Design a protein with these regions (language model features):
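A short, polar/proline- and glycine-enriched secondary-structure boundary/capping micro-motif
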Residues: 92-95, 122-128
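Short beta-strand edge/turn micro-motifs at domain boundaries
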Residues: 102-125
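A solvent-exposed, acidic/Ser-Thr-rich amphipathic alpha-helical stretch
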Residues: 22-78
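Short, low-complexity N-terminal intrinsically disordered segments enriched in polar/charged residues
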Residues: 1-30, 110, 126-131
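A short hydrophobic beta-strand element
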Residues: 77-86
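Hydrophobic beta-strand positions in extracellular immunoglobulin-like domains
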Residues: 86-88, 106
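Short, surface-exposed coil-to-beta transition loops
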Residues: 66-68, 95-102
Length: 131
């Protein structure tokens, strides 16, 4: 099931990059959690499925453009680790990027949690893995 989970995450990130929240969340469980508790920004917290669309709309709406590039997928049983770079362009034309890693947790073929980590190493260590 791991490769299927990777494809679900890849499809969700592609949909996120298009701004299609419904498609992004189409393979999530009703109890899905978007865990930004390790964020260093003002969006720190854990968001339930009902809150995620508004969170993304507010966050993406602060920029002229937002795009996430995937660097790597790591299959880990019911989890998928994704290292990525988020590219943003502000209203004044200033561009920035930030690296992060995500752990997507799956149960019965749907995502139940997406947890953000500052680095791929942090994400792997949270799962008891090493590079």
């Amino acid at each position: 099931m791991s490769q299927e989970n990777v494809e679900i995450v890849r499809t969700a990130i592609d949909a996120f990059n298009r701004g299609d929240w419904e498609a992004t969340l189409s393979a999530t469980a009703p109890e899905f959690e978007f865990d930004m508790s390790r964020s260093i920004g003002p969006q720190r917290g854990i968001y339930r499925l009902a809150e995620v669309r508004a969170f993304w709309s507010d966050w993406v709406g602060a920029f002229d453009s937002v795009h996430q590039d995937i660097e790597e997928f790591i299959e880990a049983g019911d989890e998928v680790v994704v290292s990525s770079v988020m590219h943003v362009k502000g209203r004044e034309g200033v561009e920035a990027q930030a690296r992060a890693a995500w752990v997507f947790t799956f149960r019965d073929g749907v995502a139940v949690r997406a947890s953000m980590y500052q680095t791929k190493l942090d994400a792997l260590e949270a799962l008891g893995l090493r590079e």
